[in-house]
């Protein structure tokens, strides 16, 4: 795959002189202020061969922005200029939160990976919903919902907390809404009880008068038993699909020195070290899901070849985050270019490629 020389040789070295979260905030600010200029760069894939239908919405291409990058929907007016086919905003929570104390975002340059323990920081569901309703999105938008980062919110209060967020956004024109049950960076962790998940999803569907497609986000660290339970509940509750997956709490296969990892401490790992685990989880979910359900894959994807492997494993679309940090803003188009070439080489369409390795 080609390189983004401007980013890798000039911009990335400058950004990497800053603390990771400071660099992220600088990039956000520049995109908000000068995002219109991105339209003059050759970042968009203009072919029609990569269009894909996910839960009733047609994406121009299957490469999306993963939740976590644009937590508060600040960038939805410019993301199309960077080549994305869709974007997932959030995670949003019912209440605004500062998240965990800094430092909470760390680069593993040797592994081209990140560790984060941001802790669901964000402006809150009401503020994000207001912004989404007032700005014209340049591409299909989804929203990721999580429980507010507060261990005191549990049981019925946790259900109501999630429903509060859903009520705030359910009137919006969204391609889907994802329930995040997989955040590793809060003290209470993720929802693991089948009954708890069933109650939450059932209550969301009761409020879902407009029939917004609902997805559930599953951790790549999930056991086979948990994956089976989540898929069963999601099918019973008439969900449209799955986001597979999130960061991992494991540290397998890293070249970063153990002393540095110990110094960093807890957090979710993202980037290429996660790819094998995420691909395995994708295959498991795709093999269990109902035929009408979709899988959107995320986890260490940074090339068209990576995307192709996930698509052949059952994903209808893929999402990026960490790859953007290390490869640059041209990554969505670079992936689309290579993916299109791989499909032509194999003589199949994108639709035919979805789940090809499961047949």
What are these model-derived regions, one by one?
Residues 72-81, 222-236, 286-287, 291, ...:
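Catalytic cores of alpha/beta
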């Amino acid at each position: 795959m080609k390189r983004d020389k401007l980013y890798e040789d000039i911009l990335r070295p400058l950004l990497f002189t800053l603390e990771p979260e400071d660099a992220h905030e600088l990039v956000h600010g520049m995109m908000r202020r000068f995002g219109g200029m991105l339209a003059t760069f050759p970042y968009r894939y203009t072919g029609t061969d990569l269009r894909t239908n996910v839960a009733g919405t047609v994406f121009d291409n299957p490469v999306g922005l993963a939740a976590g990058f644009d937590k508060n929907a600040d960038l939805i007016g410019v993301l199309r200029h960077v080549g994305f086919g869709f974007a997932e905003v959030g995670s949003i929570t019912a209440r605004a939160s500062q998240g965990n104390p800094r430092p909470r975002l760390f680069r593993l340059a040797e592994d081209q990976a990140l560790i984060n323990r941001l802790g669901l920081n964000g402006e809150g569901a009401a503020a994000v919903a207001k912004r989404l309703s007032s700005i014209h999105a340049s591409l299909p938008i989804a929203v990721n919902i999580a429980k507010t980062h507060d261990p005191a919110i549990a049981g019925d209060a946790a259900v109501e907390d999630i429903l509060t967020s859903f009520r705030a956004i359910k009137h919006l024109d969204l391609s889907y809404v994802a329930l995040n049950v997989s955040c590793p960076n809060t003290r209470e962790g993720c929802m693991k009880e089948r009954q708890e998940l069933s109650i939450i999803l059932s209550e969301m569907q009761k409020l879902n008068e407009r029939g917004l497609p609902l997805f559930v986000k599953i951790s790549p660290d999930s056991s086979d038993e948990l994956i089976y339970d989540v898929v069963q509940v999601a099918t019973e509750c008439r969900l449209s699909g799955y986001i597979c997956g999130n960061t991992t709490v494991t540290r397998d296969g890293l070249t970063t020195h153990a002393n540095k990892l110990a110094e960093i401490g807890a957090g979710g790992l993202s980037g290429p070290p996660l790819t094998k685990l995420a691909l395995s989880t994708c295959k498991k979910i795709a093999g269990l899901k109902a035929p009408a359900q979709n899988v959107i894959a995320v986890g260490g994807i940074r090339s068209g070849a990576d995307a192709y492997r996930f698509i052949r494993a059952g994903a209808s679309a893929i999402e990026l985050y960490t790859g953007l940090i290390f490869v640059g803003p041209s990554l969505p188009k670079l992936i689309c270019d290579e993916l299109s070439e791989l499909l032509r080489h194999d003589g199949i369409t994108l639709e035919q490629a979805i789940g090809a390795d499961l047949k």
